[in-house]
Amino acid sequence: MDPDLRGTARAGNINDLYAIIQSKPDILDKELFVETPLHVAASPGETNFALEILRLKPSFRRKRLSPLHLALQNKHSDTVRRLVKFDSKLIRVKGREGLTPLHFVAKTDDQLSFADQKVDLLSKFLDVCSSSINDVTIHEETALHIAVKSSSFYTLQFLLIWLQKTYKGEVLCLTDEGGKATLCCILRCPFHNLRHASIYSLVP
């Protein structure tokens, strides 16, 4: 990547971005990017710059990890929310091993300092793209499978309540690559305060 463009993306300076575009009008089209300015800006949480690049060059959103993955990885929740508001399809972009942003949040630790943000992000993702609950990784795992494997009680509890409210219990019947249904994984998990009877009632 052009070093001036990289530096501008890291700093999140939109004025400098347009100065570079003015001096090199085809810079966003000409370069073969491995790491795009969008990703460079999203990683440190330079939200406005990331959104401006996304507007100028929409194709960047599909390169490697999405900017949403990078913002999540670095816990820039405000950047995540604004990127989702700009383009809800980012929620279904798959990164390494087929992990979507929903899977990524389901996988993160249940740190008390981050628990409320996790629930807020899960709610936001599912509000704007409810079909993302059906997305699976290359291992055929749903967000629920991942929550169980990661011992993420807050995620699992939220998703089960969401399934109950939205009548999408069929996701509990989806199996991973080992043939284990989401429902079976949940019933065998160590979260003793989950009520098995209420979980069974979700299955259509």
Regions from the language model: what does each represent?
Residues 131-134, 138-144, 149-204:
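Membrane-proximal ectodomain caps of single-pass cell-surface receptors
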Residues 21-26, 51-60, 81-90, 123-132, ...:
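Ankyrin repeat domain, specifically the short helix-to-loop turn at the C-terminus of the second helix
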